[in-house]
Amino acid sequence: MAKKSKIAKAKRQEKLVKQYATKRAALKAKGDYIGLSKLPRDSSPVRLHHRDVLDGRPHAYMRKFGMSRLNFRELAHKGQIPGVRKASW
């Protein structure tokens, strides 16, 4: 389980990215890099880090499922992820 402050910070960053997305795209298209540098640092989508939706774990994140490998494995074994089953060959 990640620290509550880190999860809150990630949510705040996501909110900032959405808030400034159109303004950032317009400045980028215009080539106004000075204007871009005056925007808040956390409004850049590059600074976002994917986190597990269940417990906020930042490492071993699987984009397709939106969770870490640990939670993915646990839920897959329980059969709670549709279309996922144990491989055998």
UniProtKB/Swiss-Prot annotation:
One of its GO terms (cellular component) is cytoplasm. The keyword rRNA-binding applies. Keywords: Ribonucleoprotein, Ribosomal protein, RNA-binding, rRNA-binding. GO terms for molecular function: rRNA binding; structural constituent of ribosome. One of its GO terms (biological process) is translation. The keyword S-adenosyl-L-methionine does not apply. InterPro entries: Ribosomal_uS14, Ribosomal_uS14_bac/plastid, Ribosomal_uS14_sf. SUPFAM superfamilies: Glucocorticoid receptor-like (DNA-binding domain). Belongs to the universal ribosomal protein uS14 family. Binds 16S rRNA, required for the assembly of 30S particles and may also be responsible for determining the conformation of the 16S rRNA at the A site. Part of the 30S ribosomal subunit. Contacts proteins S3 and S10. This is Small ribosomal subunit protein uS14. It comes from Lacticaseibacillus casei (strain BL23) (Lactobacillus casei).
